[in-house]
Amino acid sequence: MRPAGRSNNQVRPVTLTRNYTKHAEGSVLVEFGDTKVLCTASIEEGVPRFLKGQGQGWITAEYGMLPRSTHTRNAREAAKGKQGGRTMEIQRLIARALRAAVDLKALGEFTITLDCDVLQADGGTRTASITGACVALVDALQKLVENGKLKTNPMKGMVAAVSVGIVNGEAVCDLEYVEDSAAETDMNVVMTEDGRIIEVQGTAEGEPFTHEELLILLALARGGIESIVATQKAALAN
């Protein structure tokens, strides 16, 4: 039996609260069960030097965890004077995932920074960050349209992410911390709303997995992401 009695293909309750803060062009509090992440999207005119004069925009991301988002307090990375490897890996993943959702040429020379701050961690913080940041990004892009800076919203479609894994020999979707820490195989999958894969991060933590198990996990992820995208669209319709 999984925590909270979920079936193996069932994601945790997902909540997306838009306009959570007042200053950012897009802001969303995303909740995957007890995992809570504040995602904001901020717009700046101009692009990084390597893109100047090319007539296209850029999307970047930063990720961080509050000191007591976990069971025991972790010192802020700013206090340590440098970001950890995990942090850099996750923020690059978020940025790659969301760049796939936008027509950067149609965006023009604007930079959008996605800030994902974990308030409470119970597994799946990177997948929740991508899911929430996507909704914040839609709202930020719409502000550019409303302000007359873009003619149409350059969003190509929704992007969402979910974790899957093998726990106690069974393939499961959207792992909580207790499952994640005991998983034989742990995988994060990012997809477009029509099921195309943007990224797969998979590791055999305890036991190597087969090709057949990989296909099962990807199918499980697709089903979970379809459910999450429906929640994203419902949030945007409100």
Curated annotation (Swiss-Prot):
Keyword hit for Cell membrane: no
Keyword list, A-Z: Nucleotidyltransferase, RNA-binding, rRNA processing, Transferase, tRNA processing, tRNA-binding
Top-rank taxon: Bacteria
Named cofactor requirement(s): Mg(2+)
Record field: catalytic activity: tRNA(n+1) + phosphate = tRNA(n) + a ribonucleoside 5'-diphosphate
Textual note on the cofactor: Can also use Mn(2+) or Co(2+) with reduced efficiency. K(+) simulates the degradative reaction.
Activity vs pH: Optimum pH is 8-9 for degradation.
Disruption phenotype: A single deletion in rich medium makes filamentous cells with little DNA. No growth defect in minimal medium. Does not grow at 45 degrees Celsius.
Thermal profile of function: Optimum temperature is 40 degrees Celsius activity drops off quickly from 45 degrees Celsius.
The EC number(s) this enzyme carries: 2.7.7.56
Cited Gene3D superfamilies: GHMP Kinase, N-terminal domain (3.30.230.70)
Pfam entry (one): RNase_PH
Binding site for phosphate: R86, G124, T125, R126
Cited SUPFAM superfamilies: Ribonuclease PH domain 2-like, Ribosomal protein S5 domain 2-like
Catalytic class of the enzyme: transferase
One GO term of the biological process aspect: tRNA processing
GO-annotated molecular function: 3'-5'-RNA exonuclease activity; tRNA binding; tRNA nucleotidyltransferase activity
Remarks, miscellaneous: The gene in K12 strains MG1655 and W3110 (and also other derivatives of K12 W1485) has a frameshift mutation that leads to loss of activity, although the protein may be translated. Thus in those strains rph is an expressed catalytically inactive protein. Strains shown in this entry are derivatives of K12 MC1000 or MC4100, in which the frameshift has not occured and thus are active.
Summary of subunit composition and partner proteins: Homodimer. Has a tendency to aggregate into multimers.
Family from the record: Belongs to the RNase PH family.
PANTHER family recorded: EXOSOME COMPLEX COMPONENT (PTHR11953), EXOSOME COMPLEX COMPONENT RRP41 (PTHR11953:SF0)
Role: Phosphorolytic exoribonuclease that plays an important role in tRNA 3'-end maturation; has no activity on a tRNA precursor with a 3'-terminal phosphate group. In vitro is freely reversible, adds nucleotides to the ends of RNA molecules by using nucleoside diphosphates as substrates, but this may not be physiologically important. Probably plays a role in initiation of 16S rRNA degradation (leading to ribosome degradation) during starvation.
Name the UniProt record assigns to this protein: Ribonuclease PH
Lineage: Bacteria, Pseudomonadati, Pseudomonadota, Gammaproteobacteria, Enterobacterales
